[in-house]
């Protein structure tokens, strides 16, 4: 998998960020609080770059695809950046995916 720099039009790129390495590539992970930022993702990301979501501490959260017009692969990581789950999310799906463990990071990319 090839990953490029994360893109997020809603947040100041010079704000609070972390470096995130996955599969030999470095990404910039922005702190996002999903309950307030449901529409982030790929909506205004014309290059469809992968996105990394992270939180200040591990949380239980769920993901859905109600407003997303792409099929996505999503990877869930613990605080040690080890994969603890993944899912393929169908576009405009009403289904929710809720990891059984607390997650610290989630990486979303367009399914190819």
PLM regions: where:
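Compact, glycine-rich, soluble single-domain proteins
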Residues: 2-112
């Amino acid at each position: 998998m090839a990953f490029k720099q994360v893109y997020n039009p809603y947040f100041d790129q010079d704000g609070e960020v972390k470096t995130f390495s996955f599969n030999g590539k470095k990404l910039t992970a922005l702190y996002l609080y999903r309950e307030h930022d449901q529409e982030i993702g790929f909506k205004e990301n014309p290059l469809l770059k992968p996105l990394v979501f992270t939180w200040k501490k591990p949380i239980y959260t769920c993901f859905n695809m109600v407003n997303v017009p792409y099929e996505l692969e999503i990877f869930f990581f613990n605080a040690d950046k080890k994969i603890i789950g993944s899912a393929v999310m169908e576009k405009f799906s009403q289904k929710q995916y809720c990891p059984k463990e607390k997650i610290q990071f989630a990486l979303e990319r367009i399914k190819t």
